[in-house]
Amino acid sequence: MKKKAFPAARKGRPPSEMAASHAAIMDAVYTLLQQKSVRDLTMEEVAKRAKVGKPTLYKWWPTKASLVLAMLCERMAPNLEKPTVLTAEASLRLRVRRLIDAFNGPFGKIVAGLIAEGQSELAIRQAFFDRWVGPRRAATIADLQRGKNAGELRSDTEPDLLNDAIFGAIYYRFLLGLSPFTRRFGEELVEQAIRGHRS
C-alpha cells in the first residue's frame, strides 16, 4: 500500500524577518498613539499599519495593553536608565529629570492613557505596575538604601517613603495637568524632600 504523503513542516520565520516585523509593530503603535488614545487604539489598526497579520500580534501580545506596554518599555525605558557611579542623591535627581522630560514628551500621553485604562481594568493596572512602575520604584529605593548605607542619608531615612513622596508628587502633577511641570520643579521637589535626610 502506498504511503500517504504529508506536506513538509513549515520552518519558522527567519530571525531577521521577525525582527523587522517587531520593529514595524512598535513603530505602528507609537505612531498611532500620537493620533489617538490608548482606549481608541485597536489591534486591527496596528496590524494594518505594520503590514502584519492579526495572528502575529496576538501570538506575541495577547492584549492591547500588553502591546502598548511592550512599546513603552522598549522605546521609553532606555531613556530613563542612569549611570551606576552616581551618588544616591545625584541618581535621584537624574531619574526625576528624565522622567519629567519623558512625561512632557510624546510618551506622556501614552502613560496617562494606560493609567486611565487601568482604573477600570485590574489586569492593565497590575501589568503597568509589574512592567513599568515596579522595576523603577525598586531601583530608586535600592539607590536610596545604598546612600543610607554609605552615610549619604540619615540612618532613620525610610527609602520607600522618600521615593513615594517624590514620585507620587510627580505623578500627581502629571496626571492632573498642574503647572509648573518642569525640570526646575523636579529639582526643587527633590531638594525639599531630601533636605532633612542628608547626614
Label each region the model flagged.
Residues 97-103, 111-120, 190-197:
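Helix-loop "lid/cap" segments that line or gate small-molecule binding pockets
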Residues 101-109, 113, 123-150, 160:
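Amphipathic alpha-helical packing segments from all-alpha helical-bundle domains
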Residues 72-78:
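Short, basic, alpha-helical segments at the C-terminal edge of helix-turn-helix-like DNA-binding modules
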Residues 51-61:
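Short hydrophobic/aromatic patch on the recognition helix
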Residues 80-109:
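Hydrophobic alpha-helical connector segments
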Residues 1-49, 66:
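Basic, helix-initiating cap at the start of DNA-binding domains
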Residues 2, 126, 130, 134, ...:
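Hydrophobic/aromatic-rich alpha-helical bundle segments in the mid-to-C-terminal region
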Residues 33-36, 42-43, 54, 64-72, ...:
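Amphipathic alpha-helical segments enriched in hydrophobic/aromatic and basic residues
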